[in-house]
Regions:
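A short glycine-rich, His/Asp/Glu-containing loop-to-beta-strand
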Residues: 111-129, 142
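A short hydrophobic beta-strand segment most commonly corresponding to one strand
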Residues: 145-150, 174-176, 190-207
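Short, conserved beta-strand element in jelly-roll/cupin
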Residues: 126-128, 139-155
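Short acidic-glycine-tyrosine-enriched beta hairpin
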Residues: 163-176
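Non-heme Fe(II)/2-oxoglutarate
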Residues: 2-112
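Long, compositionally biased interface segments
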Residues: 198, 202-235
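Short beta-strand His + acidic residue motifs that chelate non-heme Fe in jelly-roll/DSBH
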Residues: 133-136, 159, 177, 183-189
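Intrinsically disordered, low-complexity Ser/Thr/Pro/Gly-rich regulatory segments
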Residues: 88-92, 115, 230-235
Length: 235
């Protein structure tokens, strides 16, 4: 069946592929990614080469400009953002969305509600002390995931591993990657870690088609955040 073929092509992109990963992809937390594999492979055909992980200079200048602007906004507003999370100290993993696939959800910092050409989702996750995620896959490859540790952790036990590549936030607070690859975030320290997460449209030969597809996806997913982030407390 075409779905199985697409799934096999999709999962084979992993550098760390083994029987455990294949099982997780088809039968575990990658099942939705498997179901969406035909769409994700179509996105690959429309887009520039997928490097899996990226430096900001790997992206076109328009993408770089928006990323740098968002980073600046998070740096300017980090105290205001942290105050929002102070009311939920009992929750180990907490999340806040400013935009979700282009829909504005929180206007406490108006600049995050600007209409961006490439950025479609803007949010913040808080990992409290000794808190990590399980291994998981993002569902869609129409966008790349940008993570930015704006409270600048100082210790090495706070990091992300994406298909075998480890990024320690102490040394590089910005990480851009294809989140349909298996990944896992760790905070093994006794400190909080705030992480901005941003979804940006993949650089593409057919930008308008990508935007049109994402608009349709946004309509479908408008009220589904809790499905994708069921292990998180939303504020």
């Amino acid at each position: 069946p075409i779905w199985i073929i697409c799934g096999l092509i999709d999962v084979s992109r992993h550098k760390t592929m083994n029987p455990k990963l294949i099982k997780e992809y088809f039968l575990g937390k990658g099942f939705l990614t498997f179901i969406l594999s035909p769409l994700n492979l179509f996105a690959d055909l429309l887009s520039f080469r997928n490097l899996h992980t990226f430096k900001i200079e790997d992206l076109p200048s328009g993408h770089q400009k928006e990323i740098n602007k968002i980073i600046e906004l998070f740096d300017e507003n980090k105290e205001k953002i942290s105050e929002r999370f102070e009311k939920n100290k009992e929750d180990s993993r907490t999340m806040l969305f400013y935009q979700w696939y282009g829909y504005k959800l929180d206007n406490t910092i108006p600049e995050f509600n600007n209409d961006y050409k490439y950025i479609k989702t803007i949010g913040v996750s808080l990992f409290r002390e000794k808190t990590s995620t399980s291994r998981h896959f993002g569902p869609l490859r129409m966008t790349y995931r940008i993570l930015y540790n704006f409270n600048k952790v100082k210790k090495e036990g706070s990091f992300i591993e994406a298909d075998g590549r480890i990024n320690k936030w102490r040394y590089d607070p910005l990480f851009i990657f294809d989140d349909t690859l298996i990944h896992q975030s760790f905070n093994e320290e006794d400190d909080l870690r705030y992480c901005a997460f941003i979804d940006i449209i993949r650089p593409s030969y057919f930008e308008n088609i990508m935007k049109l597809i994402l608009s349709g996806i946004g309509i479908i997913l408008k009220n589904t955040k809790s499905i994708f982030y069921k292990n998180w407390k939303m504020i």
